[in-house]
């Protein structure tokens, strides 16, 4: 997991990029660790947690994060929410969670040659307003 703190007009936005493991025990540990980090009261301001959660059904990570954060409903923005594998997506493994005073304006899946070369997932791109 990576965290970047971005200054947006004097306000800190905390962006967490995750790539959780494929093994259930590994993902369970990572989910609990992620939930602890997100709940840290010393990290004030809005948070976005996004990336490859390796969960296509409601699992532990989804359950833990849904109690603390809002989840982006991709069906509002696109017909197909699938992001893996990139060439012919059949699974919805990539998610965006957020809290604070954030608004999601638009989300799209980039389907380009460059995106297919860069990753085995198709990227989700979100326009977010603070």
Question: What function would you assign to each model-found segment?
Answer:
Residues 1-130:
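Active-site regions of metal-assisted phosphoester/phosphodiester hydrolases
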């Amino acid at each position: 997991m990576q965290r970047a703190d971005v200054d947006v007009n004097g306000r800190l936005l905390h962006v967490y990029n995750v790539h959780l493991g494929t093994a259930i025990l590994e993902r369970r540990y990572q989910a609990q660790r992620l939930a602890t980090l997100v709940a840290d009261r010393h990290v004030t301001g809005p948070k976005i947690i996004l990336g490859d959660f390796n969960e296509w059904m409601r699992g532990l990570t989804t359950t833990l994060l849904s109690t603390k954060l809002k989840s982006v409903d991709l069906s509002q923005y696109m017909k197909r929410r699938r992001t893996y594998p990139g060439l012919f997506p059949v699974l919805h493994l990539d998610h965006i969670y957020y809290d604070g005073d954030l608004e999601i304006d638009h989300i799209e899946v980039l389907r380009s040659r460059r995106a297919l070369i860069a990753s085995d997932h198709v990227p989700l791109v979100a326009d977010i307003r603070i």
